[in-house]
């Protein structure tokens, strides 16, 4: 895979103080994986035929080579990043009574990693990771079930392969979290109304965060570097609701709402800013979804409205998005062999930012003297299209 970009973002001659820089990456990746699963049947259940079981093993080998061609490097940068993973997992689902079920599971993983590059940097860490889950499910009645669970999850550590990043920022550590969840699921009104609700709390440790830093070179030009690092601790609290209702064979209605409070308990970012107590990046306070689907014979019409609260773009600065709503619709005509659809996304042509950058000490516009300013990447504008599908 090869990709690159124009680092100066401008065309030649735009300003007397402009600079020209190209950054190109050539990556080669080889991946091999194997997973085997063994499941119980009626004759192999455990504990007096009350417990189903699952056992599995998983292996993964990944080898990634990088060649970076960059204007400000005296020679091309090379790196090789390899990791081997071997894991085993086991799960038991036990019927403690007609209404009560206990689910337990565990996964243990061994990960061996090597990294070396053309600047003579090399790392070879190994780590043993584990995660698991314990859940209790209680059947309230024939249509409703409540559950409670506690789980431990993890993300393996890794490396930032950018050749110009400081050596002490190349490696990042494992993240793990403990999650507590309570929930209920119900099927009502002759199984035409499906309801879900959940409440969760996450304690995150050594949280992996996407950071960025910028540098001014000797000639006055700038360099921007994205990398992954570790925050100390974070806490996530949230509530989720979902309702799906089919009042008739032709009409379907869906509504969902998620509320989230995700903050850093303690975190000093790459610019030595204390973000303790601040919201984590890309963690909107609410997300909502409304949808309708109506069918009459071969015709169908569907519409949806999605809403998202404001959020921070990064853990390296304080630039935020604005709240926004997106309206989508589709009208279709279908036969057994073909279908024709007229559809539109973002029908109100809402301007909304999905990513934001702010480099603090400088900007990247020579016409403004490289004054610091935010740069925003917007989502797609109003798009209207026609889709024709046929089965041969």
Predicted feature locations:
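Gram-negative outer-membrane beta-barrel transporters
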Residues: 98, 102, 201-203, 227-315, ...
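Transmembrane beta-strands of outer-membrane beta-barrel proteins
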Residues: 51-55, 102-106, 132, 146, ...
